[in-house]
UniProtKB/Swiss-Prot annotation:
The gene is VIT. Disulfide bonds join C46-C62, C66-C86. This is Vitrin. Residues 145-158 have a biased composition (Low complexity). It comes from Bos taurus (Bovine). Keywords: Disulfide bond, Extracellular matrix, Glycoprotein, Neurogenesis, Repeat, Secreted, Signal.
Amino acid sequence: MGIVVLTMKASVIEMFLVLLVTGIQSNQEMTKKMKRPKFTVPQISCDVRAGKITNVEFIVKCPPGCQDPRYHVYGADVYASYSSVCGAAVHSGVLDNSGGKILVRKVAGQSGYKGSYSNGVQSLSLPRWRESFVVSEGKPQKGVTYPSSLTYSSSKSPAAKAGETARADQSPPVPGTAAQPVTVTQAPGTTAIEATHTTLPKPSPSAGSTASGLRPQPAGQRSKDLGEPALWKPESVLLDAGFVPKEELSTQSLEPASQGDPSCKVDLSFLIDGSSSIGKRRFRIQKQFLTDVAQTLDIGPAGPLMGVVQYGDNPATQFNLKTHMNSQDVKAAIEKISQRGGLSNAGRAISFVTKNFFSKFNGNRGGAPNVAVVMVDGWPTDKVEEASRLARESGVNIFFITIEGASENEKQYMLEPNFANKAVCRTNGFYSLTVQNWFSLHKTVQPLVKRVCDTDRLACSKTCLNSADIGFVIDGSSSVGTSNFRTVLQFVANLSREFEISDMDTRIGAMQYTYEQRLEFGFDEYSTKSDVLNAIKRVGYWSGGTSTGAAIHYALEQLFKKSKPNKRKLMILITDGRSYDDIRIPAMLAHHKGVITYAIGVAWAAQDELDIIATHPARDHAFFVDEFDNLYKVVPKVIQNICTEFNSQPRN
């Protein structure tokens, strides 16, 4: 009997093992048959902004041509989600203009997105934005599932442009973790959002509802449908990560109502008179005037930006360029301004604006013209001429609006007769407006807006840094040596870096000489600062004799003959020794042709030759250093003299 029982037990065990092995084999066969679904990379167009896509991490394919300036980019390295996804990828260097795949990851919003020029794309600055993103090469991360189609924040998505289907009832898994995504059934009326978070409890399957048509729940508000307590909320996870739920996008609007008028891209400061002489009623008229101007301008990050400084005894910023990004917000801020009282020290206010207002910290964009509109009741109680000159040298276009100016009898009390003409850079009436009385001020709104937006006529925006053709004439003789030659090129790069370089602004060219001459690159070859700096790096050391006279003649023929008529012509010659040929006639010819010549001598250079080469007076145009490593000390002196000379030219 015992033997039978043992036999039966052995049979049962044997059957169990057979079934187990069969099951494992069957499972392996089924696993082999179940092929992993093929991942399809979604395609998007160049104008698709990251903020329109609700996925927090995804791979997309960009088309060619996204380097186009129509596709705006805000920031550098970390981009505001209002940016073009593909434009940002080109700017960052992940893609070139031929397109390709990129990996996009959303991150938290931040303040102070900095604009920069990189890889053929000019990104813009932005004071702050609620969501950011970063881009990298389009290589999938191990263990991360990426969506094959993208979900957009509204039904009017740009998905159709790229062949995508925007789906509101199905959300892609959130990448960034190897854990399985958790699908959350959303509250009534909201859009589905998927998220993974290993430290949060999963919601109950019955927590949501499939009912539709109800008002979406605001972020942070407890939903009755989710029960008590609300331990898990997709809104909380998204906000912590810097993301905004779709219902917030629809109610609070990810993008501003207007990006501003791009045809009037100026950085504008109003200096309003808050002195005691005005009185409350006229101060209110002044504020209404500002409001009307703000409404007419169409303020926004892609158009004009506006700030206000009030002055009396001393100036004070009411709000700066980055404080308000639309006309309505500016209007509301103006209404809150209260009068300071005191004197009418407009000169002190202009100095304050020049030194403090037009800075990156205060939202100055750099590429936009700087405009300061000074409003004066009667006349200033201090001098404005010197402060205005310094402002113009800094590239600030000054407009003066004088209301109820001094009568003939009152002019004897003025510190500075004709103060408005002394303040502006043109006395042709373009920069100064005279208003007979405060009740006529409203008539000035349209004329002023038209003038500040006419960037072609803003002569003061043409500064010493954006209005020249600069040709570098570089000594490549044997006495320089390879190491010192690289130091010379660094000096050339340091000088070039100070200028605003483009086809419309400053252009840079360079040639090298020994006994012979060689054009390294002309004025029309590179139109961006980065391209110019890279071209300077590529200049190779030649080695040979020192024929400086022939080099100057060559520069006039090969470089400056192609200079634009409206450009100042600047020649910056660097040499380390005495010339083997005559320099007098070529130098005189350069001066005769209007080429302003700076002569930089190093080590064995002859001071008498430097003085002959340099434009008169030589003390302002000829510089000498005893060794190559000290060349960097000359950079600020050259820049200062270039600007001083530019600003001393007749303006009227």
